[in-house]
């Protein structure tokens, strides 16, 4: 199975880059893991709702251009379904058993995601009502993907 994480915006902080790189390295033993950073749009100070919508649509089109019809897509959105680590691991297993060979996760930029991206999702997933910087969410989410594979393996990593 090929697993891809599409994100909006360039990661700036070294400690986040290092953490993500470590989990990407660990994931190689389970899957072909690909991280794709797409450019974000500049948000003007005091942007209007129309400007924000335009930015979301532009970023959304970039995301959709990276997703094929055959991919199972899980989009992180606050209104999505919450999963425990165990249930998330089961979801990944079930996706593989259904014959999907390409699994794509999407994390939006600071404004979130366009409705078109959410409509393309096979599943909307949420980490709860907490607000986290989208760059930090990348590290947390890559760790959870790694944890899901470790749970499938029966590893003591997940206690």
UniProtKB/Swiss-Prot annotation:
- Give residues annotated as binding S-adenosyl-L-methionine: 76, 108, 127-132
What is one term from the GO cellular component aspect held by the record?
Answer: cytoplasm
Tell me the superkingdom of the source.
Bacteria
| Record PANTHER family | METHYLTRANSFERASE (PTHR33603), RIBOSOMAL RNA LARGE SUBUNIT METHYLTRANSFERASE H (PTHR33603:SF1)
What InterPro entries does the entry give?
Alpha/beta_knot_MTases, RlmH-like, tRNA_m1G_MTases_N
To which species is this protein native? Streptococcus mutans serotype c (strain ATCC 700610 / UA159)
Keyword list (alphabetical) reads: Cytoplasm, Methyltransferase, rRNA processing, S-adenosyl-L-methionine, Transferase
Name the job this protein performs.
Specifically methylates the pseudouridine at position 1915 (m3Psi1915) in 23S rRNA.
Task: List the protein's name.
Answer: Ribosomal RNA large subunit methyltransferase H
Location(s), subcellular: Cytoplasm
List the catalytic activities from the record: pseudouridine(1915) in 23S rRNA + S-adenosyl-L-methionine = N(3)-methylpseudouridine(1915) in 23S rRNA + S-adenosyl-L-homocysteine + H(+)
The main place the protein resides is cytoplasm
What is the enzyme's main class?
transferase
Q: Which family does it belong to?
A: Belongs to the RNA methyltransferase RlmH family.
Q: Which Pfam families match?
A: SPOUT_MTase
* Single GO molecular function: rRNA (pseudouridine-N3-)-methyltransferase activity
Q: How does it assemble?
A: Homodimer.
């Amino acid at each position: 199975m090929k697993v891809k994480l599409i994100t909006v915006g360039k990661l700036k902080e070294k400690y986040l880059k290092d953490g993500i790189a470590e989990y990407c390295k660990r994931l190689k033993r389970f899957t072909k893991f690909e991280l794709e950073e797409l450019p974000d749009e500049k948000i003007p100070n005091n942007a209007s709702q129309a400007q924000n919508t335009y930015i979301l649509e532009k970023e959304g089109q970039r995301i959709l251009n990276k997703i094929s019809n055959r991919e199972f897509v899980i989009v992180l959105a606050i209104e999505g379904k919450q999963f425990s680590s165990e249930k998330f691991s089961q979801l990944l297993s079930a996706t593989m058993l259904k014959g999907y060979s390409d699994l794509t996760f999407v994390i939006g930029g600071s404004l979130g995601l366009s409705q078109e991206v959410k409509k393309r999702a096979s599943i909307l997933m949420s980490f709860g009502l907490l607000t986290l910087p989208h760059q930090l969410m990348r590290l947390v989410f890559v760790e959870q993907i790694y944890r899901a594979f470790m749970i499938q393996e029966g590893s003591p990593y997940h206690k």
